[in-house]
Curated annotation (Swiss-Prot):
Lineage: Eukaryota, Metazoa, Chordata, Craniata, Vertebrata
Pfam families assigned to the protein according to its UniProt record, in alphabetical order: Homeodomain, Pou
Cellular component per GO, a single term: cytosol
Tissue specificity remark: Detected in epithelial cells of the prostate (at protein level). Detected at the mRNA level in several cancer tissues (breast, uterine cervix, lung, thyroid gland, esophagus, colon, urinary bladder, and glioma).
Record-stated family: Belongs to the POU transcription factor family. Class-5 subfamily.
Name this protein carries in UniProt: POU domain, class 5, transcription factor 1B
Chief location category: nucleus
Region (Disordered): 1-53, 87-116, 287-322
Annotated GO MF terms: DNA-binding transcription factor activity; DNA-binding transcription factor activity, RNA polymerase II-specific; RNA polymerase II cis-regulatory region sequence-specific DNA binding
Amino acid sequence: MAGHLASDFAFSPPPGGGGDGPWGAEPGWVDPLTWLSFQGPPGGPGIGPGVGPGSEVWGIPPCPPPYELCGGMAYCGPQVGVGLVPQGGLETSQPESEAGVGVESNSNGASPEPCTVPPGAVKLEKEKLEQNPEKSQDIKALQKELEQFAKLLKQKRITLGYTQADVGLILGVLFGKVFSQKTICRFEALQLSFKNMCKLRPLLQKWVEEADNNENLQEICKAETLMQARKRKRTSIENRVRGNLENLFLQCPKPTLQISHIAQQLGLEKDVVRVWFCNRRQKGKRSSSDYAQREDFEAAGSPFSGGPVSFPPAPGPHFGTPGYGSPHFTALYSSVPFPEGEVFPPVSVITLGSPMHSN
């Protein structure tokens, strides 16, 4: 059936096309939908464009038109305005409301064109704002207020001689949370999200009020800067003291009651000694785990004995096979060294003639 359908499909012209018409002048490819609307069943008469047979002519219940795909038969869904029409009726124009989804009707009689989909999806927040025009107006007004406040904050900070880092430190003094210089910079540049801008504005508003009323704010800022610098100070231990700590660590890796005595003996703070021993234990754990893994790998060695081991290739085409049709193998050599006195086995080399000149 597939072969018969393909032959009829390729060469059967529609009815009414003689040798003189445009359809009969020369053979050509016929559009599948046009062919299905004109062509009758195999061995039956052709069907005109306005009249279609009923189920009694076909002998089977009506079904979607078949299409031949890759040697098999596949059924396609019904097309809008294309195919067989009811028996005894002429072709009628389909109203626009009954047209299929995604198809636009054309008054000129041309083929229907799919509707264009708008590029991209609109953000959820924007959709919510469009649904609530009153809320959208309130948010726009609040955004303008934030822009004006950001300009005021920058002017006030530069006029009083504060840096963005100073503002973050003073906020830490006032509210117990230090903000970074990057956060203040992004607020002034309106680069934070709308939600974060609204959260940070009351805190910065408090800073503006304190900067106008409190003259000692600059001194507080300097004191806080010194405290932050002291917190960030990196502890450095001399080589001699570090050597003594290493010796003590070998004797007792985890001292508890001896930390105070060790700190007093070496002239260090108790917290410094405690942190050093904690870091040293972590370093020892990492080193021991790496060493154990390396020992296990070396003890296991290679799963193959000495000498080449052949494996079949992976599935797929292989080019440049030296045997010209013989199975291709990849030689893997073991990393286990040969014992002393043992030499490599001789490798036999077979000279292959070129297949182009072979008789």
